[in-house]
Structures are given as structure tokens and as C-alpha cells.
């Protein structure tokens, strides 16, 4: 028998197997017909005492012979077809039953591979990665990874003592996907892929499609079952599917989950203390409900190794970061927010990725996800790598990732980070550091096609999910229809308004009249895109100071100007986003290492603090905004806005209307600390003008310069308008008047 068994030994392949260099383990492991009357069963079990084959339905076991001294076993079993069987493995007097990992059929079929190669498999995350399942009555985990240029790939983990020779994976062509079902591996088990590169090097890589990962600084992937969470947000999803975000009120609260609030944990520094997703859900939800926000936008929650990157250097695109708990915990967070009518937008980073050894960089020994040429593949500013958007599989990886967060975790929006860096080949680069496109230009044609494709994919589902671009240049048609050559986003961050306004507001009020045009500039291009006004985290870090810290003047001036700022922002066309802490005048610049300065809201000498009154104003303003359709229904239509006064630079005052079918609002903004007892405002029609919001009201911490009585217009021309009203114009304030037309009686001839 020994001599006969030896006739079937493929020694070169067996040696490659034992060195972890075998890409076709199915040729030397598992069962196959040796001849018409014998089945050859082989297995690799290093460092065990004996192995036998137990055939299903048979009482007899067939002891396997160790063909060499490295743990390669074989046996010839009489039979005309391959039976069902298991291995009986003995070590130190203990026997255990082990199903054969190489007896299972492939789960990657030709259609899967064709779609992936063509970049159109938007559920590829259901195939690649780690998926606990039961196959033929055997519980285990199915692993699959894309590594076309690797010589061999093994899945390693605690379940096989991290040995690369124990579970070599089977390569499936033409896609270059390695797969293997490993019996006995389940939820919570650690794993990585051991990749034998064409250079002869061996590296351990985290799974690009892993659903969970170890808490940093550890880097292993974790097997997780995403099918067990039971969602309860059906009503929210049904409403969202009918939602027209262009015509709805959108108030976004931008949040860094790990620094909103932090628990006190004995023996840990504050920077290492985090609430879990489940713990954070009611805390954040209650606050957003109290404040009147419609959505939260989470700075990246995808797995990342470095806290100081704030999540913008991602290594685990399919894994909610373990800093705050498990994938089920994150699902609970989103579900909880939805059940309380708050949407969840995710920051997403398709522009670049870090060079960490366990991540995507040179994944299979080649530049698989990135460009080979560093002029195309590296971001000099960030020290990161740029995706190769010209490779179908890379586009598929990213597109499927966005769809994964939408489908698997029910998120309501995707905010794409650093879009400008994707659009321009020379972004952040000097001459000689970039490669022109086929036409000699600096436009990244492949990135453009990718952005159009991903927006198309998201919007074709008609689920009501928003896409938002952080795009800092004047690239045309960011929110234009893909069919018309646009990129297809729902909204673009209005960086122009933000930069102009922040420069203006940091100017001493005495000199603001010289920069008056900065207040009105944004309306010159307002209708070129569908905009979202933002005061984001980027503006309160890196020495820029908090919103409170930017503003000149004393404490009261700062708080008054913040009320004015947020009121002007609410009245200006465009959806809104504000970074956490700025709504109550956080004094210190933001840091991811500590929670917000909530103590600023505590009473001072038994009285409400100015910061608490500012918070109350923002809460009132948010509710006010949602109650007045004129402030949001026609954000993208010129008919929804009208200037009344743009030239009063000497007083640093602007006046405008916001309009919709059912209401007209008049807004005044005074950007100096000067109070005007009788300020004349030209109005376009005769009517009654009732003040319904004044940021200088005493209850908000102001001086109380309000207009308690309705103002009746007079037939007196002012600012080119046929009628006018006279109001108290409060210092550093925004005031909103409800306008009601009154029929003018004609004089008898």
C-alpha cells in the first residue's frame, strides 16, 4: 500500500505546500479519484500524532500514512466515487473530528468574477472577505481575497496558530481571487492573509473586506456575522425613499464620535476613553433632538490605525472602528437615530489611503490598489497613496463599499472627502511631480468617471440617500446631472462662502466696511451648484482657533457675533452643517483627545451662562428654520431669494428676502456693534412686517433691542424700493420679519 500511495505523491507541489508557497492546494489536498476503484484522500496536519479518515455511514476508519515527516498524510480508500468523510486527528491522546476544508465547492462563480473584473459587482462584499456560514452541515467561515499577483495566499489566525502552511487558499482565475472555507472558524476569531509575493517576500495583510478589526494598535481582522442584527427603522426608510432632499430642511451636526463626550475610566487617560456606539446613541440623539438637528454627520468611523488622522486615513473600509464597539453596536447606533427621526451621514474617503504595512499598500506585492508611478500614486501633502481609478477592480472595491454602508448599515448620506484632490492630477504637486492625461490636461478623467459612476449607482436605488462633495475649487457641475456631464452629487460644500465669511468676520467691525463685498459674493454663484453651507471641523483646528476664538471683541461681542453668524447662515440659501461645540461657543480649539467643554454651559453665579444662552438660541433657530419653508424650499432657485440692500458698506448692513409660495421673510444683518434706533429699510411691496426672530433678544443673551410691534410700510422710496419701514436695528444681530402684503387703496380721480 505504501508503495502504491507513493505513486500518487506530487512532491514538488507538496514541498511548496509545506513552505506556504502553493497556489493550487486543491491539487494535493482533499479527495480525488486515484483510479477506477480507489479514492485518494490527502491532508496536511503538522505536529499531530495520527490522522484517520472516517467515511460517512461506514463503521471503519482508514488510518492515513504520513508521507513525509512534515505532516502530509495520505490514504487510498476503496470506492468508485468520492464519499462524504471527516478526518479524525489525534494529538497527545485527544481525538477531534475535523471536516476537510478542501472538500467544499467554490463559492465564486464565473459571473462573479466577470462582474468584478468589469468593475460592476456592487455586492462583491458578499463574496470577498470573511463570512461565517454552515456548508453541508459544517459550521465554519468562508474566506476570499483579491490578490492576483501573489504566488500563494494562506489564511492565518489563532485557529491555526498563525501558520501559513495550514490553510493555503485556492486561486480562482481569471479574477485572481483566493478562497477557502475553513471549518470551525466563527464569529470573533482573529485572522489575516499571509501573502507570498512574487518578490519572494511574505507579508501579513488585514482583510480589505473585513467587517470588523482589532482595536489599535493591533491590526488583525475579526470574523463577524452581519446577518444577526434585527433592524427596527422600517418607517424611517419608507419616509426617506420619498424624500426630496433639495426641498427639505437639512441641518447637519458634524460629530467626532470619540470626542463628543468621554466617559471617566479609572487608569486611562482621557484620550483613550470612549463610549461605545450603543452608549453614545442615546447621548447624541437626545442632544440632537434638543437642538433640532435633522442629521448627524460622523467623521470617518471606518477602521483606521492613527487617532490623529481623525479617521481620514482608512485601512478597514468595510469595518466600523473597534474604538467604539462592534458592527452590531454601530447598527444599533444608526437604528436608534432613525427611530428618533435623525439621519446619519458618513464621511467617506475614496481619495487616498495610508501606507501602513498591514493595509492596502502593495497588497499582493504589486501596486494593486494604487498607481505604480509615484507621480500618479502618491499624495505629497498627506504622505498617502492615491487609488488607481483606471482599474476596474479598484473602482468596484470603492463603489461596493459605499453601497455596503448604505445597504448594510442603512446610512442616509455619503459625504466624500477631498474630492478636489481626486479631480486634479496636479493637486498639491509641482511641475514634474504629476503626469498629464491623454489630452495633456490636469483633469483626472478616470476619477471623474468613477465619481459619476458611484453617484449613479447610489441614486439608481431611489432610496433617498444623499451624496455630498467636499470640493474646494470651482470645478463645474459638481451637482449637475451625470447625463449632462456633471458629477452627480446632491450637494457641494460651499467653501467659497465659508472662506469669505470667516475672513470677513475675523476683521475688526471698524474695518468691515472695506470688505463688505465678502458678504454678498456668494450670491453671485449661488445657483451654479446645489450648495451646503458649512462651518466644519477643518476650520477649528491646526491653530485656526474655535469660532468663538476667531471673533474680535469682548466676551459679549463674541457671543453676539456667533448668534449673528448662525442666524445669517440659517437665512442664506443652502443646507447647513455646523461642527460640534461651535453651537455653544466652545472657546478652545478642537482636539480629538478630549471631550467638548461642556462645563461652559454650567450656570455662573446662579445665572445661565452666555454659552448656554447661545446654545438655546441655536436650538430655537434650528426649530425656527424648519418651521419656515421660505428658508429651505427654494434653496436652489433664484426665485427664493431677493436682495433689498447690498451697498450699505458704511453701516455693514445687508437686507434680503427669502421667499416661497406660502411666505416671504425679510432678513436684516448688522455686522457692527452700533445700535440704530430708527433704521430705514426699503421694501418691495406695501404690507405689514412683523419681527419673528431677533438674535439680540434678552432670552438669548442680547441687549433686548427688539421690535415688539408690527411695522406698517410707508409709501416712501428707499434703496430703489417703492416702500419702506423703520425698525430698531440691533447691534451685531440678525432679525427676521414676516411679510404680509396689503392691498393699496387707489385714490379716487
What do the predicted segments below correspond to?
Residues 68, 147-149, 173, 184, ...:
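Short, flexible loop/turn elements at secondary-structure junctions
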Residues 285, 334, 402-406, 455, ...:
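Non-transmembrane alpha-helical segments in soluble domains
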Residues 49, 151, 294-296, 412, ...:
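Short acidic/polar active-site loop segments enriched in Thr and Asp
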Residues 1-249, 278-288, 556-559, 570-578, ...:
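Carbohydrate-interacting/catalytic domains
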Amino acid at each position: 500500500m505504501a508503495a502504491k500511495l507513493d505513486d500518487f505523491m506530487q512532491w514538488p507541489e507538496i514541498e511548496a505546500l509545506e513552505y506556504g508557497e502553493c497556489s493550487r492546494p486543491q491539487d494535493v489536498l482533499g479527495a480525488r479519484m486515484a483510479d477506477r476503484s480507489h479514492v485518494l484522500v490527502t491532508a496536511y496536519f503538522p505536529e499531530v500524532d495520527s490522522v484517520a479518515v472516517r467515511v460517512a455511514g461506514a463503521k471503519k476508519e482508514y488510518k492515513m500514512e504520513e508521507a513525509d515527516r512534515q505532516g502530509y498524510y495520505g490514504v487510498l480508500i476503496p470506492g468508485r466515487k468520492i464519499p462524504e468523510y471527516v478526518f479524525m486527528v489525534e494529538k497527545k491522546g485527544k481525538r477531534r473530528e475535523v471536516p476537510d476544508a478542501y472538500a467544499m465547492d467554490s463559492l465564486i462563480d464565473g459571473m462573479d468574477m466577470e462582474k468584478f473584473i468589469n468593475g460592476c459587482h456592487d455586492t462583491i462584499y458578499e463574496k470577498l472577505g470573511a463570512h461565517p456560514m454552515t456548508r453541508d452541515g459544517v459550521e465554519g467561515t468562508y474566506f476570499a481575497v483579491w490578490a492576483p499577483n501573489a504566488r500563494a495566499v494562506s489564511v492565518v489566525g489563532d485557529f491555526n496558530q498563525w501558520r501559513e502552511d495550514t490553510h493555503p487558499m485556492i486561486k480562482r482565475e481569471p479574477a485572481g481571487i483566493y478562497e477557502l472555507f475553513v471549518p470551525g472558524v466563527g464569529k470573533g476569531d482573529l485572522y489575516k492573509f499571509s501573502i507570498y509575493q512574487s518578490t519572494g517576500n511574505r507579508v501579513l495583510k488585514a482583510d480589505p473586506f473585513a467587517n470588523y478589526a482589532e482595536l489599535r494598535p493591533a491590526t488583525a481582522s475579526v470574523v463577524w456575522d452581519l446577518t444577526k442584527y434585527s433592524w427596527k427603522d422600517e418607517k424611517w426608510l419608507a419616509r426617506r425613499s420619498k424624500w426630496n432632499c433639495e426641498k427639505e430642511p437639512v441641518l447637519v451636526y458634524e460629530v467626532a464620535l470619540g470626542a463628543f463626550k468621554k466617559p471617566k475610566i479609572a487608569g486611562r487617560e482621557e484620550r483613550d476613553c470612549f463610549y461605545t456606539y450603543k452608549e453614545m446613541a442615546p447621548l447624541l440623539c437626545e442632544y440632537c433632538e434638543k437642538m433640532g438637528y435633522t442629521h448627524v454627520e460622523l467623521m470617518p468611523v471606518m477602521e483606521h490605525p492613527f487617532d490623529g488622522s481623525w479617521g481620514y486615513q482608512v485601512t478597514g473600509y468595510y469595518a466600523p472602528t473597534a474604538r467604539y464597539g462592534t458592527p452590531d453596536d454601530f447598527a444599533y447606533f444608526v437604528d436608534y437615530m432613525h427611530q428618533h427621526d435623525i439621519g446619519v451621514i458618513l464621511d467617506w474617503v475614496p481619495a487616498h489611503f495610508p501606507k501602513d504595512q498591514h493595509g492596502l499598500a502593495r497588497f499582493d506585492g504589486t501596486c494593486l490598489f494604487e498607481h505604480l508611478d509615484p507621480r500618479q500614486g502618491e499624495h505629497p501633502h498627506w504622505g498617502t497613496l492615491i487609488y488607481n481609478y483606471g482599474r476596474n477592480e479598484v473602482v468596484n472595491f470603492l463603489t461596493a463599499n459605499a453601497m455596503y454602508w448604505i445597504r448594510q448599515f442603512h446610512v442616509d448620506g455619503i459625504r466624500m472627502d477631498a474630492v478636489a484632490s481626486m479631480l486634479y492630477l496636479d493637486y498639491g504637486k509641482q511641475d514634474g511631480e504629476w503626469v498629464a492625461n491623454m489630452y495633456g490636461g490636469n483633469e483626472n478623467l478616470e476619477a471623474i468617471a468613477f465619481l459619476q459612476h458611484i453617484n449613479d449607482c447610489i441614486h439608481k436605488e431611489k432610496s433617498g440617500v444623499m451624496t455630498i462633495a467636499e470640493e474646494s475649487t470651482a470645478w463645474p457641475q459638481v451637482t449637475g446631472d451625470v447625463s449632462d456631464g456633471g458629477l452627480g452629487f446632491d450637494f457641494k460644500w460651499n467653501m467659497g462662502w465659508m472662506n469669505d465669511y470667516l475672513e470677513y468676520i475675523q476683521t475688526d467691525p471698524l474695518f468691515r466696511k472695506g470688505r463688505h463685498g465678502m458678504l454678498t459674493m456668494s450670491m453671485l454663484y449661488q445657483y451654479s451648484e446645489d450648495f451646503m453651507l458649512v462651518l466644519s471641523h477643518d476650520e477649528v483646528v491646526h491653530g485656526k482657533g474655535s469660532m468663538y476664538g476667531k471673533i474680535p471683541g469682548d466676551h459679549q461681542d463674541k457671543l453676539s457675533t456667533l448668534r449673528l453668524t448662525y442666524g445669517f447662515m440659517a437665512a442664506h440659501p443652502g443646507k447647513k452643517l455646523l461642527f460640534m461645540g461651535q453651537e455653544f461657543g466652545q472657546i478652545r480649539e478642537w482636539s480629538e483627545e478630549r471631550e467638548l467643554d461642556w462645563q461652559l454651559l454650567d450656570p455662573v453665579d446662579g445665572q445661565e451662562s452666555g454659552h448656554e444662552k447661545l446654545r438655546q438660541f441655536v436650538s430655537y433657530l434650528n426649530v425656527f428654520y424648519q418651521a419656515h419653508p421660505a428658508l429651505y424650499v427654494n434653496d436652489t432657485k433664484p426665485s427664493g431669494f431677493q436682495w433689498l440692500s447690498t451697498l450699505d458698506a458704511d453701516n455693514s448692513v445687508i437686507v434680503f428676502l427669502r421667499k416661497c409660495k406660502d411666505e416671504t421673510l425679510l432678513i436684516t444683518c448688522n455686522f457692527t456693534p452700533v445700535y440704530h434706533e430708527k433704521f430705514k429699510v426699503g421694501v418691495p411691496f406695501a404690507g405689514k412686517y412683523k419681527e419673528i426672530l431677533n438674535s439680540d433678544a434678552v432670552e438669548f443673551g442680547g441687549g433686548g433691542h427688539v421690535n415688539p410691534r408690527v411695522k406698517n410700510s410707508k409709501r416712501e422710496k428707499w434703496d430703489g424700493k417703492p416702500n419702506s419701514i423703520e425698525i430698531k436695528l440691533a447691534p451685531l444681530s440678525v432679525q427676521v420679519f414676516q411679510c404680509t402684503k396689503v392691498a393699496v387703496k387707489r385714490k379716487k380721480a
